[in-house]
């Protein structure tokens, strides 16, 4: 195999969710369809590199900063949803369940991975809350050890502020069967049950 092709496969393997076989298939597909797919792929990647940037307010990725969400006058500017990653923001937007603004942390606290409060956008979040513009913070971190640790850290950091804090509910997903749920999910669902 040509060294340049090998190098491209190795590079593709670094992308999330791609192993050696998937990387090989993608590279081979791009090279086989160079006139239709490869050229368009290269042009699009170049355009993204030149035009896409992080929103100075929330951390979203768009061609303008502030992003369209932060610029929108139709959204609640005083309700901010805190998420770990941009993909979480995109998922919430796709669901259409939040009409406020966002704050992307760029990860979750993890001693194992060396992710500390200083490497996340927590200080920037503190400044947003301290400005008085935020009345409610919806902490929408993942239901993982790291996500919950991050959520608790944010609560501690914001103690004493006037901002209302809330967490997303956790528990049994819609459409799931009890037999397929793990003990942790069932435990959370029972602990957070509500009266009807």
Curated annotation (Swiss-Prot):
Stretches annotated zinc finger (C4-type)? 55-70
Q: Which SUPFAM superfamilies match?
A: Recombination protein RecR
User: Taking every annotated instance into account, which residue ranges of this chain make up the domain Toprim?
Assistant: 78-173
- UniProt-recorded Gene Ontology molecular function terms: DNA binding; zinc ion binding
Keywords assigned by UniProt? DNA damage, DNA recombination, DNA repair, Metal-binding, Zinc, Zinc-finger
- In the UniProt record, does the keyword DNA repair occur? yes
The protein's matches in SMART domains, at most eight in alphabetical order, are given as: TOPRIM (SM00493)
According to its UniProt entry, the protein's GO biological process terms are: DNA recombination; DNA repair
Q: Which InterPro entries match?
A: DNA_Rcmb_RecR (IPR000093), Rcmb_RecR (IPR023627), Rcmb_RecR_Znf (IPR015967), TOPRIM_dom (IPR006171), TOPRIM_RecR (IPR034137)
Pfam families on file = RecR_C (PF21175), RecR_HhH (PF21176), RecR_ZnF (PF02132), Toprim_4 (PF13662)
What's this protein's family per the entry?
A: Belongs to the RecR family.
HAMAP family with a match to the protein in the record: RecR (MF_00017)
Functional description taken from the UniProt entry? May play a role in DNA repair. It seems to be involved in an RecBC-independent recombinational process of DNA repair. It may act with RecF and RecO.
NCBIfam families, per this entry?
recR (TIGR00615)
What is the name listed in the Swiss-Prot or TrEMBL entry for this protein? Recombination protein RecR
């Amino acid at each position: 195999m040509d060294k340049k092709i090998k190098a491209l496969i190795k590079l593709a393997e670094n992308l999330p969710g791609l192993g050696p076989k998937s990387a090989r298939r993608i590279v081979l597909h791009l090279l086989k369809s160079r006139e239709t797919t490869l050229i368009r792929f290269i042009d699009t990647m170049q355009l993204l590199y030149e035009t896409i940037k992080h929103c100075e307010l929330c951390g979203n990725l768009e061609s303008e900063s502030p992003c369209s969400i932060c610029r929108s006058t139709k959204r609640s500017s005083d309700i901010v949803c805190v998420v770990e990653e941009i993909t979480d923001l995109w998922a919430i937007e796709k669901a259409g369940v939040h009409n406020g603004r966002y704050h992307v942390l760029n990860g979750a606290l993890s001693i194992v991975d060396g992710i500390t409060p200083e490497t996340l956008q927590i200080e920037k979040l503190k400044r947003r809350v301290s400005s008085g513009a935020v009345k409610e913070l919806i902490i929408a971190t993942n239901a993982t050890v790291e996500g919950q640790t991050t959520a608790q850290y944010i609560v501690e950091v914001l103690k004493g502020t006037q901002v209302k804090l809330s967490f997303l509910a956790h528990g049994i997903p819609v459409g799931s069967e009890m037999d397929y749920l793990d003990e942790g999910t069932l435990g959370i669902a029972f602990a957070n049950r509500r009266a009807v």
